[in-house]
């Protein structure tokens, strides 16, 4: 069965989430949040940001459960996590929200685009 992968980054909500909406219009989706230790080690990341992300992830998971889905929380470098996901169950599209981040998240997004 083909499906689209929705990679949630900082925008952890469904309301007006263009990437989620586009993927859902195409068919089944798998929603993931990748916790990337290297990004959380950046000087502009604080414990409060991490705690807010976890709280938002719990709320997103609850909303997805109400809709019959779930949020998969994965840990690792984004390209490596995507490699593992694709090897286990190939997806045909990858959707994510364009975010404003720092140099590290920009480099990560460029690496994923090359992937």
Task: Name what the model sees in each region.
Residues 1-115:
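Trp/Phe/Arg-rich N-terminal binding region typifying the photolyase-homology
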């Amino acid at each position: 069965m083909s499906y689209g992968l929705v990679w949630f980054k900082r925008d952890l909500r469904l309301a007006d989430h263009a990437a989620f909406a586009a993927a859902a219009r195409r068919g089944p989706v798998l929603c993931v949040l990748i916790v990337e230790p290297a990004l959380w080690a950046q000087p502009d990341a604080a414990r409060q940001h991490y705690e807010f992300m976890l709280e938002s992830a719990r709320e997103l998971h609850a909303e997805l459960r109400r809709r019959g889905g779930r949020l998969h929380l994965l840990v690792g470098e984004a390209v490596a996590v995507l490699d593992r996901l694709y090897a286990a169950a190939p997806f045909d599209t990858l959707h994510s929200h364009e975010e404003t981040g720092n140099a590290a998240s920009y480099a990560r997004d460029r690496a994923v685009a090359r992937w």
